[in-house]
């Protein structure tokens, strides 16, 4: 059964949709500035800025050199349950041949498998 809150016209969808411009801008910025694994310094800074704007409770940096972990505390601490979400941030050593305003500004590097999108959405 489908919950009406999750339909394209539902409340949850409308709430998430209000962030579309910011998420699109972040994804395009990450796409334009690709970095190989363990070199994601710019990406890490941008992700940290976005997490701070979201008001996460804690941000731990330097995980696996360039990774981050954000802690969001739920309203109820009684269950002890936790959920972990993750996204890769690295790009690939591939030349980008797309021609749009947010194409890679780094010769021979691009986000070719969606890590920019995964990072922005998470």
Task: Map each language-model feature to its residues.
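Acidic/His- and Gly-rich active-site-bordering loop/insert found
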Residues: 2-111, 120
């Amino acid at each position: 059964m489908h919950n009406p809150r999750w339909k394209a016209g539902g409340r949850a969808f409308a709430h998430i949709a209000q962030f579309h411009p910011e998420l699109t801008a972040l994804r395009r910025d990450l796409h334009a500035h690709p970095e190989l694994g363990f070199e994601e310094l710019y990406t890490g800074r941008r992700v940290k800025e976005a997490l701070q704007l979201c008001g996460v409770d804690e941000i731990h940096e330097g995980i696996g050199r360039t990774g981050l972990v954000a802690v969001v505390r739920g309203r109820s601490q009684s269950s002890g349950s936790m959920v972990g979400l993750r996204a890769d941030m690295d790009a690939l050593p591939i030349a980008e041949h797309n021609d749009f305003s947010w194409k890679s500004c780094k010769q021979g590097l691009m986000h070719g498998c969606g890590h920019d999108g995964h990072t922005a959405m998470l």
